[in-house]
Amino acid sequence: MKIEAWPMYGPLNSTDVFAKFIKSMQATGDHVCIDRETDGDVAVIWSVLWQGRMRKYKQIWERYRQANKPVIVIEVGGIRRNKSFKIAINGVNRKADFANQDVDNTRWPLFNHVFKPWKQTGDNILILGQHDASEQWNGMPGMNIWFEQQINEIRKHTDRPIQVRPHPRNPISLDLKKYKNVSLTRPIMDSNTIDDTNFK
């Protein structure tokens, strides 16, 4: 298989993981072309967030997807940032194929993480934002508009306090003065936490 891998546009935290991923592909005998355009069978990129260093990944993504060829996407994990990683085909999260049909339950204990029960009650309704420069948000309104839509929909059903929390790397400017009992909590970067961000 001919693989086009692009570590050069990855964020700074991708270097080690990308290098190990390339090494694993080469070990299987695949022909891996690094940081150059070829007529590959598959491309490998880091994330589908078209921002900063990763902005150029969008061209690679579009070239392969328009040719109906797969794109392997590597991304930081959703559990412990920079200690767990996602690897999927044609996206991340719900749009992705993680090829995990045959994964057993022996991997979960390695995270040393305990699930807490889902809370059905509480004082606040929390609305969490996505990064609107991400392929995951493709076709959706800007984050400010989306937050307002969610607030208006929630207000049709309850007057409970609403807390709006944007994506840590996607600042917003939302005028909450026109809403009653709605607050904005900006994430604070904290490298001592599981996801480099506070959750308070």
Predicted features along the sequence, with ranges:
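N-terminal pre-catalytic "stem/leader" segment of glycosyltransferase-like enzymes
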Residues: 1-51, 133-134
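Catalytic donor nucleotide-activated moiety binding site of glycosyltransferases and closely related
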Residues: 6-10, 148-190
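Short, charged/polar "capping" segments at the starts of alpha-helices
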Residues: 11-18, 52-56, 81, 135-136, ...
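Well-ordered, non-membrane alpha-helical segments in soluble/globular domains
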Residues: 15-23, 53-59, 141-153
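Hydrophobic beta-strand scaffold residues
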Residues: 32-33, 70-72, 162
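Short loop/helix-cap segments at secondary-structure boundaries that form the rim of catalytic
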Residues: 37-40, 119-121, 172-181
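A donor-sugar binding/catalytic signature common to diverse glycosyltransferases
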Residues: 42, 187-200
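A nucleotide-sugar donor-handling region in carbohydrate enzymes
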Residues: 69-140
